From Swiss-Prot:
<dbReference type="InterPro" id="IPR022803">
    <property type="entry name" value="Ribosomal_uL5_dom_sf"/>
</dbReference>
<dbReference type="GO" id="GO:0006412">
    <property type="term" value="P:translation"/>
</dbReference>
<dbReference type="InterPro" id="IPR031310">
    <property type="entry name" value="Ribosomal_uL5_N"/>
</dbReference>
<keyword id="KW-0820">tRNA-binding</keyword>
<dbReference type="GO" id="GO:0005840">
    <property type="term" value="C:ribosome"/>
</dbReference>
<dbReference type="Pfam" id="PF00281">
    <property type="entry name" value="Ribosomal_L5"/>
</dbReference>
<keyword id="KW-0699">rRNA-binding</keyword>
<dbReference type="GO" id="GO:0000049">
    <property type="term" value="F:tRNA binding"/>
</dbReference>
<dbReference type="InterPro" id="IPR020930">
    <property type="entry name" value="Ribosomal_uL5_bac-type"/>
</dbReference>
<dbReference type="InterPro" id="IPR031309">
    <property type="entry name" value="Ribosomal_uL5_C"/>
</dbReference>
<keyword id="KW-0687">Ribonucleoprotein</keyword>
<dbReference type="Pfam" id="PF00673">
    <property type="entry name" value="Ribosomal_L5_C"/>
</dbReference>
<keyword id="KW-0694">RNA-binding</keyword>
<comment type="similarity">
    <text>Belongs to the universal ribosomal protein uL5 family.</text>
</comment>
<dbReference type="GO" id="GO:1990904">
    <property type="term" value="C:ribonucleoprotein complex"/>
</dbReference>
<comment type="subunit">
    <text>Part of the 50S ribosomal subunit; part of the 5S rRNA/L5/L18/L25 subcomplex. Contacts the 5S rRNA and the P site tRNA. Forms a bridge to the 30S subunit in the 70S ribosome.</text>
</comment>
<keyword id="KW-0689">Ribosomal protein</keyword>
Amino acid sequence: MAYVPRLRQEYNERVKSALKEEFSYSNIMEVPKLTKIVISRGVGGAVADKKLIDHAIDELSAISGQKAVSTISKKDVASFKLRKGMPIGAKVTLRGYRMYEFLDRLITSALPRVRDFNGIKSNGFDGRGNYNLGVTEQIIFPEIDIDAVNRIAGMDITFVTTADTDKEAKALLTELGLPFKKN
């Protein structure tokens, strides 16, 4: 039998039926699912120091288990000495098994390492069933060697789902194990 990530198996066995019952869908294919996770990071000092982009790409690659790519500026901004086409950040898009593996590591090992952690805020939904989570330090991930970090930097993690509403998306992410704050 082939390997299946723990959260993928849990989604298929438990979460699908729970969401179908909760929102009374008529068809199992209506149940929302996680499509992709995008981890992105802007590097403000990249205009002056090109090595910062390489460090960001290396760290995102270590965290995600997949090669990250640099993002480039779309237009000139004179006040930042920024030209069109200059690298200004890094991102990685996770789908399939790698997405579920990353989500599992985020829930079980990274989020508990956040100082004074008591759940993630539920105000990061965009109205279309997607959720954005901001992480302030990359050192919460066990894949990052603290001694090798030259600058503490945060990142944005976007969970893209097929849910139509924020309520459905929150129910999906809660069932998968994301610890939202109790209001």
